[in-house]
Curated annotation (Swiss-Prot):
Organism lineage: Bacteria, Bacillati, Actinomycetota, Actinomycetes, Mycobacteriales
Function of the protein: Permits nitrate and nitrate transport into E.coli. Involved in excretion of nitrite produced by the dissimilatory reduction of nitrate.
Note: One of the activities induced in M.tuberculosis by hypoxia is the dissimilatory reduction of nitrate to nitrite, which serves to provide energy as the bacteria adapt to anaerobiosis.
Name of the protein in question: Probable nitrate/nitrite transporter NarK2
Membrane-protein topology: Multi-pass membrane protein
Transmembrane portions of the chain: 8-28, 45-65, 72-92, 98-118, 131-151, 157-177, 205-225, 244-266, 274-294, 301-321, 333-353, 365-385
Gene Ontology annotations for the cellular component aspect, listed alphabetically: plasma membrane
Gene3D superfamilies: MFS general substrate transporter like domains
Regulation: Increased nitrate reductase activity is seen under hypoxic conditions, however this seems to be due to induction of the probable nitrate/nitrite transporter narK2 rather than increased enzyme activity of the probable nitrate reductase NarGHJI.
Location(s), subcellular: Cell membrane
Length: 395
């Protein structure tokens, strides 16, 4: 289809910039905690707040994409994220924890971009290629890696508020380019039905809740680690904020690069098998992380491989969604599933902060909870989740 590659690439770039904006607080969390004398729980809440709003907002932006189209919604979310980015910069410059948490809520708007881009990418590709298209769009998660790597450095080079102004300018310029270049797929037809009934209809589909459960683990794990890993690394291994950001960027990049691999594999073998392998690997590697492997080589190998497992799983789950969700409900189902993924990323930082053992300096309890959850999901997928029948997968 003419224009599909260009539109997919541009939509992915829009996702990159919004994911960077969504993840602005996490890479600086250790600095905020030090400068504002925050407790572990307060720092965890600060990191988790944008994740919560980004998750819940996806329930709305998904069906709105069915109604107004991906082009309009990608532009709208990008523009709506500019002011919160600047407001967070002001609050950070003032050193106000309360304002940071408050404006961090609105920073979550940028995180809703995922529920917009998935149906947009779906509309441009045939069912047999949707694992690929959603995997490529999912590479927009690299924005978290860019944020983890560059945000602390930008603060050191340019200053705190200027860093936020740079991200706001990137959002604005991206929105302008999208207005000129981005187009909805020729086959897109707006769904004018009211949003609430469509959400209720999507909520009645078994695929919605099965995929929500699985995505809450694989994508939630990615989001949680991408935001909380700087705190984890500095606490456990004593690295500086910049060094922790670089290592977190490596984690996020590995997950991002693995996501299209998960989609590609799902186009060739059953997504169920891809997700099963992802969950089993996640459980094994989270257990290894709980043992606190030595810094550098062993810890890096553990977390990078964990990132690959999570990334492959995210690609596999959404390839599964693309096969099973009814065509008229893709946006609504995507919104709910994506929200579940975001919520899956909201609670782990809070749990990690609450279960941290300052005496032994470890997060063992939190990591073992991830092991148990991944094993439960793996067992459920093996025994109950099934591939779609042809009626579900038809478009």
């Amino acid at each position: 289809m003419r224009g599909q590659a260009a539109n997919l690439v541009l939509a992915t770039w829009i996702s990159v910039v919004n994911f960077w904006a969504w993840n602005l607080i996490g890479p600086l969390s250790t600095s905020y905690a030090r400068d504002m004398s925050l407790s572990s729980a307060e720092a965890s809440l600060l990191v988790a707040t944008p994740i919560l709003v980004g998750a819940l907002g996806r329930i709305v932006t998904g069906p709105l994409t069915d109604r107004f189209g991906g082009r309009a919604m990608l532009i709208a979310v990008t523009l709506a994220s500019i002011l919160p980015v600047l407001a967070v910069g002001v609050a950070a410059t003032m050193g106000s924890y309360a304002l940071l948490v408050f404006f961090g809520l609105f920073l979550g708007v940028a995180g809703t971009i995922f529920a917009v881009g998935i149906p947009f990418a779906n509309n441009w590709y045939q069912p047999a290629r949707r694992g690929f298209s959603t995997g490529v769009f999912g590479m927009g998660m690299v924005g978290t890696a860019l944020s983890a790597f560059f945000t602390p450095r930008f603060v050191r080079w340019f200053g705190l508020f200027t860093t936020h102004a740079i991200v706001a300018a990137a959002l604005a310029s991206t929105a302008v380019v999208a207005m000129v270049v981005l187009r909805d797929a020729p086959y897109f037809r707006p769904n004018a039905d009211p949003v609430l009934p469509r959400l209720k209809a999507a909520a009645r589909l078994p695929v919605t809740w099965e995929m929500s459960f699985l995505y809450a683990i694989v994508f939630g794990g990615f989001v949680a680690f991408s935001n909380y890993l700087p705190t984890y690394i500095t606490t456990i291994y004593g690295f500086s904020t910049v060094d922790a950001g670089a290592r977190t960027a490596g984690f996020a990049l590995a997950a991002v690069l693995a996501r299209p691999v998960g989609g590609w594999l799902s186009d060739r073998i059953a997504p169920r098998h891809v997700v099963l392998a992802s969950l089993a690997g996640t459980a094994l590697l989270a257990f290894a992380a709980a043992l606190q492997p030595p810094p550098e080589v062993w810890s890096a190998a553990t977390f990078i491989t964990l990132a690959v497992c999570l990334g492959v799983g995210t690609g596999g789950v959404f390839a599964w969604v693309a096969r099973r969700a009814p065509a008229a409900s893709v946006g609504s189902v995507t919104g709910i599933v994506a929200a579940a993924g975001g919520l899956g990323g909201y609670f782990p930082p809070l749990v990690m902060g609450a279960t941290y053992d300052p005496v032994d300096n470890d997060y063992t309890v939190g990591l073992l909870l991830l092991v148990a959850t991944a094993l439960v999901a793996c067992t459920y997928t093996a025994l109950h989740a099934r591939e779609p029948v042809s009626e579900e997968a038809s478009r």
